[in-house]
From Swiss-Prot:
NCBIfam families: PRK00299.1. GO terms for biological process: tRNA wobble position uridine thiolation. This is Sulfur carrier protein TusA. Belongs to the sulfur carrier protein TusA family. HAMAP family: Thiourid_synth_A. InterPro entries: Sulphur_carrier_TusA (IPR022931), TusA-like (IPR001455), TusA-like_sf (IPR036868). PANTHER family: SULFUR CARRIER PROTEIN TUSA, SULFUR CARRIER PROTEIN YEDF-RELATED. Gene3D superfamilies: TusA-like domain. Sulfur carrier protein which probably makes part of a sulfur-relay system. Keywords: Cytoplasm. It is found in: Cytoplasm. It comes from the Bacteria.
Length: 82
């Protein structure tokens, strides 16, 4: 699974931030991305384990991978549902 997190198009460092800041930053970053680009998010707020997958479903983006077993949590999303 580690290979999935290599070479994202964009990176977002959200460690130390608390709800709702991480998802707000994800939304702002994704708005500037092109369709199909990827974003690697590093976070340590437990609420991101439900908020980021929910954001992807609600906004029709793809959650490519999530690693929430250890800190920092890692999420890889692709803009759009392709």
């Amino acid at each position: 699974m580690t290979a999935l997190f290599e070479n994202p198009t964009h990176n977002l460092e959200a460690q130390g931030l608390r709800c709702p800041e991480p998802v707000m930053m994800v939304r702002k970053t994704v708005r500037k991305m092109e369709e199909g680009e990827t974003l690697l998010i590093l976070a340590d707020d437990p609420s991101t384990t439900r908020d980021i997958p929910s954001f992807c479903r609600f906004m029709d983006h793809t959650l490519v991978a999530a690693d929430t077993e250890t800190l920092p949590y890692r999420f890889l999303i692709r803009k759009g549902s392709n």
